[in-house]
Amino acid sequence: MASSSMSSSSSWTSKQNKMFERALAVYDKDTPDRWQNVAKAVGSKSAEEVKRHYDILVEDLMNIEQDLVPLPKYKTVDVGSKSRGIDDFDLRLMKNMRIQ
């Protein structure tokens, strides 16, 4: 994926990513000076950096939608496994739960 090509100098923390996502929700494509506003909201990135981050995100999404990204191979897990912290009582409770 494209995001793996990013250098460490342009790495993003989870907090920066969350601020980026929130800013994208506020400043849509029709907002004047969108990337400057998003950069201000993130706080520690330039307009060029947030635009590049957005372009990488769009490319990643397109690759996922086109099935170019393989699904992860998950291990099967025994739900009743004591090592997972679930005992028989918990299993009976979950079995009888009704979500409303």
UniProtKB/Swiss-Prot annotation:
Coiled coil: none annotated. Its main location: nucleus. CDD domains: SANT. Keywords: Nucleus, Transcription, Transcription regulation. InterPro entries: Homeodomain-like_sf, RADIALIS-like, SANT/Myb. It comes from the Eukaryota. GO terms for molecular function: DNA-binding transcription factor activity. It is found in: Nucleus. Residues 7-59 form the SANT domain. GO terms for cellular component: nucleus. Probable transcription factor. Assigned as a member of the MYB-related gene family, I-box-binding-like subfamily. This is Protein RADIALIS-like 5.
